Amino acid sequence: DAVLVKENDNKHTKCKISDTADSKRVYGVFADWDNDDDTVNDMYVTAVGTHVVRINKDVTVQAGDLLVSNGDGTAKVQDDDIIRSKTIGKVLTNIKQETYSDKSYTVPCALYCG
């Protein structure tokens, strides 16, 4: 006889905000915390599609720029125009959607990292 034990919420990959510049392990962009009342600390991650991406305060982007991790939870412009395993996505417009207290900001992007 076998016993099947279901582990709650064990289907999700564990993740963290990227702390490695140019990381090939980035698989999405933080969207929001799941604030339900369970005991699990879940977050929503946006992958393929369109979403805003947070850009480092010292980085200026243009529409068409490819983005990679800056290693501090924000993105920077990729060194070339070739979509790579480290590419997060492409900037759709440089119009800032939100600016944070640390002067980082978000812009709309097409995401490639899902």
Mark where each language-model region is.
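Extracellular receptor-binding modules and their adjoining Ser/Thr/Gly/Asp/Asn-rich linkers
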Residues: 1-114
